[in-house]
């Protein structure tokens, strides 16, 4: 049996909380090694994207979570998928069986990927992450997180190992 997993997430500047991003960063390499396709939103591009409708008017900051499973079921909500959220947060989500909504959600994800996201990949020698994006001016490849400063990356590198999983 085969399966495909694709995720669209926000880079450091678009997250509500740097500690949550530090937790996500821990797993990027492993997810890529497992074949997960990672896309990270470029906040500055969301508002400029032509085909995103009301989503394009957002600032590119995220709190909502959405997932489509097998093209039949979707999850939409604000609940994080972690033990702390299950036990302590009052956020929620809806699980809806609807192939039509799943198709719409996947189409939106594809538009975001095409117009306002970098695809995260491993470098050819698999020693580092790279952020790839096609633009009208040509292909762009970055070796540092988009829209992040040296200080932000240093801070995340310092605090990342110190943040316990159950605090994320």
Model-derived regions, located:
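PLD/PLD-like phosphodiesterase catalytic module centered on the HKD motif
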Residues: 2-168
């Amino acid at each position: 049996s085969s399966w495909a997993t694709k995720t669209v997430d926000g880079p450091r500047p678009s997250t509500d909380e740097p500690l949550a991003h530090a937790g996500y960063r821990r797993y990027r390499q492993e997810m890529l090694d497992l074949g997960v396709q990672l896309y990270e939103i470029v906040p500055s591009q969301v508002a400029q994207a032509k085909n995103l409708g009301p989503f394009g008017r957002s600032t590119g900051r995220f709190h909502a979570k959405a997932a489509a499973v097998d093209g039949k079921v979707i999850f939409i909500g604000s609940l994080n998928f972690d033990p702390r959220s299950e036990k302590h947060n009052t956020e929620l989500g809806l699980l809806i069986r609807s192939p039509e909504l799943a198709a719409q959600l996947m189409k939106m994800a594809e538009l975001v990927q095409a117009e306002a996201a970098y695809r995260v990949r491993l470098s050819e020698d698999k020693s580092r992450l790279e952020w790839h994006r096609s633009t009208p001016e040509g292909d762009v490849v970055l070796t540092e997180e988009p829209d992040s400063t040296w200080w932000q990356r240093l801070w995340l590198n310092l605090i990342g190992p110190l943040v316990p999983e159950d605090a994320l």
